[in-house]
């Protein structure tokens, strides 16, 4: 069996590499992976994450996490994981030049980008899009897509991770080649599922659409990512994906519990018990000692949350180093949170969240709204794309940003154009557009 090599895995080559006139400035002030991080922070799609719901509806009187705050926190945890792993690898491979910040910067940048392809209304937005094409009005276009050679599975299993890879690599109308022109290492770190929708099976998870398949293959070849299967192609995970995934798992699971407490969905006793279950006996005793000096319950929860995140971060960093040989051969495929000593506590917290948090009325209402809003917008835009000469169609398409190619010829291309447009919306923009095109909110009212 083959093995991946850190020499080739850490590469600052960029997609559609730009010609630089300031190499000395860039090498002196920022390395290439720091440029990736900064490029995303200053981008419009990243800013729009501030008005995309994580789990709970926005805005509210109690400030809970949105996609932006979540991504920033994941990036912080990812950086810490990168530092832990760098320290361990430097000891293990003394001859290799593991630069102090490269892995941490790559993981941190990838963490920033991991949710940039998600549509409005949280994960319910992904489910709403998939349901529309699988069992809703969108099913009527399946025969047309397949007869044209398109990949229908890309839509009935719509995946925000694949959409993030498209957003970062696709050349939208009027934009530069290579999308964000990020480094190959940062882009590879985003692809949690290194295969297309043809290999997704019943998991409904995949890493790239048919339109970006060649782009990922190019990146994989340059970095030396192992190919595990041909036709359809399945690759081993790029090693740093495990760190990005762990950072996301740690943050969303722990922060969802804290948000649920702030919204009074769960009690102080429940959240503190769940947080304590992640800690060993010694840490529990230390935590209780500190908690005696804290009167404010919100501050108590915040303190426990910080201890748990720190504890899980260290555990996942150690797990990566333990399983690194199997990761490098593509044999290890489990999330890091599933192989740490705290795995059972993670499972218990996840079960609790699904039973008591993700079924809360506010969360369910967001999902119901998402289904209705997406169905209406997709239907109207697809009608406009299919019949562009109609008066209503011309009016509707005039609202669409010029970066989206409304002149796509194939049905697959028209659907993808529609989903590019919708997934770039914020929650408020999607809701406002829905109200306007249905006449619920008239501009002169």
Annotate the PLM regions.
Residues 394-442:
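C-terminal amphipathic alpha-helical interaction region
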Residues 2-18, 425-445:
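Structural signal for terminal/edge beta-strands and the immediately following C-terminal loop/tail
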Residues 73, 242, 246-249, 308, ...:
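Charged, amphipathic alpha-helical oligomerization/scaffolding segments
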Residues 321-402:
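Substrate-recognition/cap regions that form aromatic- and gly/pro-loop-enriched pockets
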Residues 1-29, 41-52, 61, 72, ...:
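Sequence-structural signature of the catalytic-core scaffold of metal-dependent phosphohydrolases
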Residues 57-66, 110-113, 149-150, 232-233, ...:
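Glycine- and acidic
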Residues 35-47, 338-345:
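Acidic, low-complexity proline/glycine-rich segments
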């Amino acid at each position: 069996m083959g093995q991946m090599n850190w020499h080739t895995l850490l590469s600052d080559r960029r997609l559609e590499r730009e010609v630089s006139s300031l190499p000395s400035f860039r090498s002196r002030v920022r390395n290439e992976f720091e440029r990736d991080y900064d490029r995303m922070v200053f981008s419009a799609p990243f800013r729009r994450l501030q008005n995309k719901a994580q789990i709970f509806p926005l805005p509210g009187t109690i400030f809970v996490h949105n996609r932006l705050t979540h991504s920033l926190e994941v990036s912080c945890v990812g950086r810490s994981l990168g530092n832990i792993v760098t320290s361990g690898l430097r000891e293990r491979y003394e001859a290799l030049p593991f630069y102090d910040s490269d892995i941490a910067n790559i993981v941190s940048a990838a963490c920033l980008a991991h949710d940039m392809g998600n549509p409005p209304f949280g994960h319910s937005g992904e489910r709403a899009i998939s349901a529309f094409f699988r069992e809703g009005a969108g099913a009527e276009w399946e025969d047309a897509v397949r007869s044209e050679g398109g990949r229908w599975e890309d839509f009935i299993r719509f995946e925000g991770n694949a959409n993030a890879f498209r957003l970062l690599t696709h050349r939208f109308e009027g934009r530069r080649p290579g999308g964000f022109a990020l480094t190959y290492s940062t882009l590879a770190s985003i692809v949690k599922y290194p295969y297309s929708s043809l290999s997704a099976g019943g998991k409904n998870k995949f890493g790239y659409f048919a339109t970006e398949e060649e782009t990922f293959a190019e990146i994989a070849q340059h970095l030396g990512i192992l190919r595990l299967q041909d036709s359809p192609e399945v690759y081993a995970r790029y090693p740093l994906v495990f760190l990005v995934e762990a950072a996301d798992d740690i943050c969303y699971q722990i922060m969802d519990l804290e948000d649920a407490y702030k919204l009074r969905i769960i009690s102080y006793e429940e959240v503190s018990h769940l947080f304590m279950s992640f800690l060993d006996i010694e840490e529990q005793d230390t935590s209780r000692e500190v908690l005696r000096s804290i009167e404010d319950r919100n501050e108590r929860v915040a303190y426990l949350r910080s201890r748990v995140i720190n504890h899980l971060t260290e555990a996942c960093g150690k797990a990566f180093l333990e399983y690194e040989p199997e990761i490098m051969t593509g044999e290890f495929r489990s999330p890091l949170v599933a192989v740490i000593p705290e795995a059972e506590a993670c499972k218990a917290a996840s079960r609790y969240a699904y039973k008591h948090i993700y079924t809360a009325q506010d969360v369910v209402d967001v999902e119901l709204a998402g289904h209705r809003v997406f169905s209406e917008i997709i239907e109207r835009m697809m009608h406009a794309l299919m019949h562009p000469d109609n008066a209503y169609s011309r009016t509707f398409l005039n609202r669409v940003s010029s970066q989206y190619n409304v002149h796509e010829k194939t049905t697959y291309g028209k659907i993808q154009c529609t989903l590019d447009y919708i997934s770039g919306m914020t929650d408020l923009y999607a809701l406002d557009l829905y109200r306007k095109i249905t006449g619920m909110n008239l501009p002169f009212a």
